[in-house]
Amino acid sequence: MKKKRFNSDIEVQAFARHICMSAHKMRRVIDQIRGRSYEQTLMILELMPYRASYPIFRLIYSAAANASKTMGSKEADSLISKAEVNEGTFIKKLKPRARGRSYPIKKPTCHIIIVLKDKSKKPKSFLERKYGFVDKYMIGK
């Protein structure tokens, strides 16, 4: 599968993998925060009564720390541009039952992808990303 590109000048990604919760339960929380600002998202996640909100809270906090470290942007200027939950592998266990038998137990896991976008910065053009600058002769009047 082809990896999707993103604009690294104004966006920061954070991944969480193999979280022991079904993707359906996690999507219930992710759908509430998609497209909101960083501060508003943290407030919503603190007040939600779901168990799924804590791993998402930690991941968004980590993504904001990545943004401030790599891009030097303020956390207040961040916006959640993409929030995605995918199903992971199943953790398989055997539960002992009567007469020496065993029943399989499958626990679902999920993967979360959060992309934070900086509202204050504008995306660079292709030439600026490739060469680091844009000269008037490169544009070609």
From Swiss-Prot:
GO MF annotation list: rRNA binding; structural constituent of ribosome
Entries under Gene3D superfamilies matching the protein: Ribosomal protein L22/L17
Predominant location category: plastid
GO biological process, one term: translation
Pfam families: Ribosomal_L22
UniProt entry tagged with the keyword Ribosomal protein: yes
PROSITE patterns: RIBOSOMAL_L22
UniProt entry tagged with the keyword RNA-binding: yes
Classification via InterPro entries: Ribosomal_uL22, Ribosomal_uL22_bac/chlpt-type, Ribosomal_uL22_bac/org-type, Ribosomal_uL22_CS, Ribosomal_uL22_sf
Gene Ontology, cellular component aspect: chloroplast; large ribosomal subunit
Keywords: Chloroplast, Plastid, Ribonucleoprotein, Ribosomal protein, RNA-binding, rRNA-binding
Compartment list: Plastid, Chloroplast
Stated role: This protein binds specifically to 23S rRNA.
Family statement: Belongs to the universal ribosomal protein uL22 family.
NCBIfam families named among the record's database cross-references: rplV_bact
PANTHER family: CHLOROPLAST 50S RIBOSOMAL PROTEIN L22-RELATED (PTHR13501), LARGE RIBOSOMAL SUBUNIT PROTEIN UL22M (PTHR13501:SF10)
Subunit structure: Part of the 50S ribosomal subunit.
Official protein name in the record: Large ribosomal subunit protein uL22c
Source organism of this protein record: Chloranthus spicatus
Lineage: Eukaryota, Viridiplantae, Streptophyta, Embryophyta, Tracheophyta
